[in-house]
């Protein structure tokens, strides 16, 4: 190793586990584990180390890789001013990944474990299209039929909670660290929903006794590939699973931990009952901002996000739409300047070291638009204004879903509903109202005549003149 690598300054052998974390991926290792590493470096919380765990084959591969390096994770911050590398030592073990999750259940039953945290991805919570828990999913049905041999994280959590209840041990707190709104509520619905399928008494006990705090997490963390491994080698580290990330990180969470928690407020975590306000700010400004730059960039054949932000038309379009149509409808956030948050987001989007792609930002628009863009559309209309920038964005999304860029490059399928979207975009070219008629995206907004007229004009202009020309005209207005 070289001197430029920061290593744990505390005695890792003195750590004892207080947290089981299910789903040890890149985000967890660049986020929760880093915060705990910082806390341990202060000489505090040494009984809150992490035991890694997982329920999928990919978790077994991660366990093998980390075990070979004493469960240390290399985390490289991609700051344009210079990369920084550290070895994070907050994890002291990684449980065997087993089909019946016996080792995981046993570990979570240990009274020393007071928090079970999860990063199982947004799609790992067994919800249906409406966002409700889906009791008919085959994995859930199987766990309900064989609760002593669960295959899912939620089945294992329930088995451990039942063991703790029967032994008179205080239940652990279940803490989702996934990037989805109301993640505590979603997790509670999954755990209780599964319990109700096979043990109503256990379900009632979980409802009454187990805490599921909501939290907002944020840090851009790319997938690991050859480039990331090369970066680690540049620091003298032969790590097959290094993590790269942006310098920025944020964690906002409800202070609802009946079994206790580490003092993470000492290392920058915000504990507040107002998590929803922070979520709304992030969803409207960051996630909504991603959508604003995604589709015009893609139509203009700009492939990288930082390159899009370096294009004066794209950057100006983002800023104008945010300031005039999104920010005015973001509810106040405690101790936060909304304009300063926008400045931060624009800076993060512009980081050339991250190499995020516009195609990733365009992904899954049929699910993202209703969450990230349509609420701002509605708020503007309710205030008596037609948000021309957001309407133009909707037209650009429609044009993108037609399946070609302005130069004629074919857009590969980029949405779970791509075929249906492409068919509708083709019909909308002649009849723009077809696009707004997607009630699963726009609800009843098609009935707003002013919106419908503005959308029709915008889509016609996009087809006639192309994305670059319509952005230039919009910005000149």
Swiss-Prot record:
One of its GO terms (biological process) is mannitol metabolic process. The keyword Transmembrane helix does not apply. Disulfide bonds: none annotated. It catalyses: D-mannitol + NAD(+) = D-fructose + NADH + H(+). It comes from the Bacteria. PROSITE patterns: MANNITOL_DHGENASE. Pfam families: Mannitol_dh, Mannitol_dh_C. NAD(+) binds at residues 19-30. Its EC number is 1.1.1.67. GO terms for molecular function: mannitol 2-dehydrogenase activity. Keywords: NAD, Oxidoreductase. It is an enzyme of class 1 (oxidoreductase). Monomer. Belongs to the mannitol dehydrogenase family. This is Mannitol 2-dehydrogenase. It comes from Cereibacter sphaeroides (Rhodobacter sphaeroides).
């Amino acid at each position: 190793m070289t001197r430029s690598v920061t290593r744990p300054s505390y005695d890792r052998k003195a750590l004892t586990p207080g947290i089981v974390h299910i789903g040890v991926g890149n985000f967890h290792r660049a986020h929760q584990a880093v915060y705990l590493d910082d806390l341990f470096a202060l000489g505090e919380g040494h009984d809150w180390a992490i035991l890694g765990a997982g329920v999928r084959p990919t978790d077994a591969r991660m366990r093998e890789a980390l075990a070979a390096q004493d469960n240390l994770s290399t985390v490289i911050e991609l700051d344009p001013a210079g990369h920084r590398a550290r070895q994070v030592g907050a994890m002291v073990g990684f449980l065997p990944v087993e089909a019946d999750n016996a080792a995981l259940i046993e570990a979570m039953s240990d009274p020393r474990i007071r928090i079970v945290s999860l990063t199982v991805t947004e799609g790992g919570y067994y919800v249906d299209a409406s966002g409700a828990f889906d009791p008919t999913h085959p994995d859930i049905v199987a766990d309900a039929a064989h609760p002593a041999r669960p295959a899912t994280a939620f089945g294992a959590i329930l088995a451990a909670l039942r063991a703790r209840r029967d032994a008179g041990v205080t239940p652990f707190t279940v803490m989702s660290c996934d990037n989805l709104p109301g993640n505590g509520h979603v997790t509670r619905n999954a755990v209780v929903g599964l319990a109700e399928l096979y043990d109503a008494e256990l379900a009632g006990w979980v409802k009454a006794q187990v805490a599921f705090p909501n939290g907002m997490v944020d840090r851009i963390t790319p997938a690991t590939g050859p480039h990331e491994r090369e970066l680690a080698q540049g620091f003298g580290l032969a790590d097959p699973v290094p993590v790269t990330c942006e310098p920025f990180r944020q964690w906002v969470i409800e202070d609802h931990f009946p079994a206790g928690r580490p003092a993470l407020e000492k290392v920058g975590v915000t504990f507040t009952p107002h998590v929803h306000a922070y979520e709304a700010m992030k969803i409207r400004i960051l996630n909504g901002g991603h959508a604003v730059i995604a589709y015009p960039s893609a139509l203009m054949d700009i492939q990288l996000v930082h390159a899009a932000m370096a294009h004066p038309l794209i950057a100006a379009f983002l800023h104008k739409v945010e300031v005039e149509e999104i920010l005015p409808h973001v509810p106040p956030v405690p101790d936060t300047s909304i304009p300063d948050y926008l400045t931060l987001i624009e800076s993060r989007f512009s980081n050339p070291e991250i190499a995020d792609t516009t195609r990733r930002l365009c992904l899954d628009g049929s699910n993202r638009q209703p969450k990230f863009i349509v609420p701002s559309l509605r708020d503007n209309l309710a205030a008596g204004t037609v948000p021309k920038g957001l309407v133009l964005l909707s037209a650009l999304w429609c044009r993108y879903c037609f399946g070609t860029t302005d130069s004629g490059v074919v857009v590969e399928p980029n949405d779970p509903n791509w075929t249906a979207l492409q068919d509708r975009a083709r019909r909308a070219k002649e009849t723009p109202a077809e696009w707004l008629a997607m009630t699963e995206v726009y609800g009843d907004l098609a009935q707003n005549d002013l919106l419908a007229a503005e959308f029709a004009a915008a889509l016609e202009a996009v087809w006639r003149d192309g994305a670059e020309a319509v952005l230039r005209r919009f910005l000149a207005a």
